[in-house]
């Protein structure tokens, strides 16, 4: 079988990653839940301290965040197969004055791309 991934598949992966970016902008988990698998995980560093666990931790953080974050984001698909993808996001968020680098691990399940892992590092300004 030849390795071939269509541009529409890349677009679908980026659209799934934008569920996360838009959730950060809105301060609501509703949009994030459209992109993340319910059993997903999150691991990374906040203020130099390792944090990790269920993706529900991110949902709680989003729901406790005030609405109206100004976000600048750059997304790159750094690796992709027909059923897996890794997306790197560079996010600048105000307020709070924090930047993030995220690596979103995705799997295509029943024809739909879902984020199953978020590995991140935060950079307070």
Swiss-Prot record:
<dbReference type="InterPro" id="IPR039437">
    <property type="entry name" value="Put_lumazine-bd"/>
</dbReference>
<dbReference type="Pfam" id="PF12893">
    <property type="entry name" value="Lumazine_bd_2"/>
</dbReference>
<keyword id="KW-0413">Isomerase</keyword>
<dbReference type="InterPro" id="IPR032710">
    <property type="entry name" value="NTF2-like_dom_sf"/>
</dbReference>
<comment type="function">
    <text>Aldolase; part of the gene cluster that mediates the biosynthesis of the alkaloid (-)-FR901483, a potent immunosuppressant that shows efficacy in animal models and a probable inhibitor of purine nucleotide biosynthesis by targeting phosphoribosylpyrophosphate amidotransferase (PPAT). Within the pathway, FrzH is a new kind of aldolase with no similarities to known aldolases, and which catalyzes the intramolecular aldol condensation via formation of a C9-C3' bond to yield an aza-tricyclic product.</text>
</comment>
<comment type="pathway">
    <text>Secondary metabolite biosynthesis.</text>
</comment>
<protein>
    <recommendedName>
        <fullName>Aldolase FrzH</fullName>
        <ecNumber>5.5.1.-</ecNumber>
    </recommendedName>
</protein>
């Amino acid at each position: 079988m030849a390795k071939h991934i269509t541009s529409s598949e890349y677009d679908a992966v980026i659209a799934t990653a934008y569920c996360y970016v838009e959730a950060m902008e809105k301060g609501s988990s509703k949009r994030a839940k459209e992109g993340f698998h319910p059993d997903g995980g999150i691991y990374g560093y906040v203020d130099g301290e390792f944090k990790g666990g269920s993706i529900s931790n991110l949902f709680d953080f989003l729901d406790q965040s005030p609405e109206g974050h100004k976000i600048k984001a750059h997304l790159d698909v750094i690796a992709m197969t027909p059923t897996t993808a890794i997306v790197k996001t560079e996010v600048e968020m105000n307020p709070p004055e924090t930047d993030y680098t995220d690596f979103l691990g995705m799997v295509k399940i029943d024809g739909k791309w879902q984020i199953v892992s978020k590995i991140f590092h935060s950079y307070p300004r």
